[in-house]
Amino acid sequence: MFYKFIQVFIGFFVKLIFRVEVFGMENIPKEEKRLIICGNHKSNLDPVTISAIFPRQIFWMAKRELFKNKLVGGFLTKLGAFPVDREKNDLKAIKTSLTILKDEKVLGIFPEGTRVSEIDYTTIKSGIALIAQKTDSEILPVFIEGEYKAFRKIKVYFRKPVKINKEIKYSNEELENISQDIMRMVYGEEIKWKLF
């Protein structure tokens, strides 16, 4: 109830101020099933924008620094966000992600780990592919285009969802390659070979 209220309230202003234009809504799975939102990260407003237009609640993985302020941290927690330590393999965050997906909910991740202005696929580790395969979840690549300036247009593209074959045992290097390919899909690149 709280999430829905905030979604509608903040969503109204986000759509109004940034004139959000959405493409590919037909690519969003209709069924209430396990799903990972995987997006590029340009601004702290990215999760707000995606959440404002997405029909289901998204449980965002967010940098732990945001939770240091008790007021902000409490608000984010109430919205379903949870902290991740980007400097190490955060097992607690991984376990939280697995629980969210096993409960047939939607997990939101920015695999680049921080806001970026230039693409560098080599920074993408195996995490998203590993979590997706372990939970047999679909991945929905999402691309945000534009600058967050008043009355400038922001465009959101929902790409076609993909799923990793859970029956195949991949090496860590292969999982990294898959994760990097998923980010290529986010940016609209055509993948000529696939491991999934």
Labelled PLM ranges:
Residues 26-30, 98-99:
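Short amphipathic alpha-helix with an adjacent loop that forms part of the alpha/beta core around
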